[in-house]
C-alpha cells in the first residue's frame, strides 16, 4: 500500500493539474465564442460571392477551366489541423481520415500532393514520408485572410497550372460546442457551382461590365480562396470546442481521482492510527 506521504503528494499534484485544465477550459470557452462569431460572420460574404459567381457561370456560354472537370492524373489534398494539441480527437480524427483516403485512392506518391495548414498535420505527414508541397503554421487563435492568402492563392494557381487536376479539403466542421464533424469537401473544379444559383437568380437579367468572362477570371479564384478561408474559420471554432471539451473531461477526471485518493488517504490514515493504538495498548499490557 502507498504511504500517506505518497498519497498526499499525488493529491496535491492532481489538484494543481486540475487547476490548469480548468483554466484552459475557461480560456477555450472564451476563444470558442469569438471563433464561432468569426465563422458565422463570414458566411454571408461567402454566400453572396457564391451567388454572384453562380449567376454568371450559369448565364454564359463561356467555360472557365476552374469550372470544368478534366482527366485526373494527380489529386491535391488540403488538410487543416492545428498547431497545438490537448484538443481530444480533433487532430487525430482529421489526419486519420485524410491518410486513409490517400492510402486507399493512390498507389504512388506521384498521384497526389498534400498541402497542410497546422504544425501537427505537417509533422504527421512528414513523419510518414509523405511530402508536403505547401504549408502554413503558427497561425493565431483569430486568423485573418492575409494569414493564408499566399497559400490559398498558390493552391488555386497550382490547379490552374495543372499541377493537380482536382483538389479536396479535409477539415473539422463545427456543429456545436460538443460536436464536430470530420469533413471532406471537393474544392476544385467548381463543378457544382450552378447548384448555388436559385431559379430566380438564373432567370434574372444582368448586364456585366467588363465581360462575363473577365469577371469570372477574377471572381472564381477569389471564390475558391474564400472557401479555403471559410473552412479554416470553421476548423478554428471546432478546435476551441474540442479543446474545451477535452479540458472539461480532464478536469472531471481529476476531480474523481482526487476523491478516490482522498478516500484512500483517509483509510490509510485510519489504519495507521489504529495500528499505533494497538501497539500502545499492546506495550502497556506487556508492562503489567
From Swiss-Prot:
Keyword Secreted: no
GO biological process: proton motive force-driven plasma membrane ATP synthesis
GO MF assignments: ATP binding; proton-transporting ATP synthase activity, rotational mechanism
Signal peptide bounds: none
Topology of this chain in the membrane: Peripheral membrane protein
Record-linked SUPFAM superfamilies: ATP synthase (F1-ATPase), gamma subunit
Disulfide bonds: none
Main location: membrane
One GO cellular component, as annotated: plasma membrane
Localisation per UniProt entry: Cell membrane
PROSITE patterns listed in its UniProt record: ATPASE_GAMMA
Recorded family membership: Belongs to the ATPase gamma chain family.
HAMAP family tied to this protein: ATP_synth_gamma_bact (MF_00815)
Matches recorded under PANTHER family: ATP SYNTHASE GAMMA CHAIN (PTHR11693), ATP SYNTHASE SUBUNIT GAMMA, MITOCHONDRIAL (PTHR11693:SF22)
Purpose: Produces ATP from ADP in the presence of a proton gradient across the membrane. The gamma chain is believed to be important in regulating ATPase activity and the flow of protons through the CF(0) complex.
Designated name of the protein: ATP synthase gamma chain
Species assigned in the record: Bacillus pumilus (strain SAFR-032)
